[in-house]
Structures are given as structure tokens and as C-alpha cells.
């Protein structure tokens, strides 16, 4: 765990939301002295992480105005979402980003290399195809979901986003650790 002092720099703001009440409460407590930090719990349904959630992920509207952020970050979010939910969250990221704004998101991207490594038993997650999905557990797909690389451009273009640089491949499927466990996608809002 590393500590930085970026929270003492007061230009701008940091706004976050999550479906994990305990995580939000921790952030609210530890960042309370810094008025430019704001965290809120959202009661969004997720079969794995928040099965009693009252708001559908496909209908959730981020609690922020249009064009309000320079940067958005979503770590280990799309790895637990169904395709229609991913589409909505990408649309929402696009909506809240300013023109030219960027986002860093993580995902499990399924391509030929990942499929070969999973088939060879090198992956930390035993993904398998179930219908249109590539999941760890067919009974609770939201436990871990991979996005087909061939579908990624469609998701992004439909949301008005594009990749801003190459995908930084993660080590989840047995690749050497280079950048991260999950695949890193740097996105940019289209003008």
C-alpha cells in the first residue's frame, strides 16, 4: 500500500461512487478533512457484489452533470458486468466527461492469445464460453466476465469513446506481469 500526498492538493475535485457500502464509508471517514473529496454509495444491483441492489445497472445514471470531469477511472468494474450494463456505463462515462476528457478502465479482454493461455491452464481465471458470454461461473456471470476484443470497438464507438493508445495487456490470463493484473484501456471522449 502506497501513500501519496495528492489529496492535499486542492485544485479540482475527486468524486467517487461504489456499490460497496463499507468501502464508501472508509473513504468518507479517511478523506473527511478534504472538502474536495466526495464519495457516495449507490444501490446498484450486481448479482455477485450487491444482489439486493434496487437500481438496475442498465438504467443507472451517474450522479453527476454532463461534461463535468476531465478524467474518469473504473477499476474492476467492467469485469463484473453484463454487456448491456457495460454499454450503459460507457455511455455514462462519455456523458460526464468533458470534450477531450479521458478515462482509464480495466477489463478482461478476450482475444486469441487469452483463449490459448486459458486453454493451456495458464490463466488465474478458468473462463469458459456460455452462450454469448465468456465467464468464470455460468450461474453467477458477474463473478468474472471477459469482453471479446472483437466487440470492444462496437462498445466504444456506440458510446462516443475511442481507445487513446494501445491496450496494456494484463497478466490475468498468464501473460508476464508488465502493467497490471487486468487489461488497461485508456479511453478518450470523441469531439
Annotate each language-model stretch with its function.
Residues 65, 87-99:
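A short glycine-rich, Lys/Arg-flanked "PGG" loop and its adjoining helix->strand segment in the class I
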Residues 76-77:
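Short catalytic micro-motifs in class I SAM-dependent methyltransferases
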Residues 80-81, 112:
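Short glycine-rich, flexible loops that bind phosphorylated cofactors or substrates
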Residues 1-5, 10-61, 88, 102-191:
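Class I (Rossmann-like) S-adenosyl-L-methionine-dependent methyltransferase catalytic domain
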Residues 69-70:
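Local beta-strand N-terminus motif with an aromatic residue
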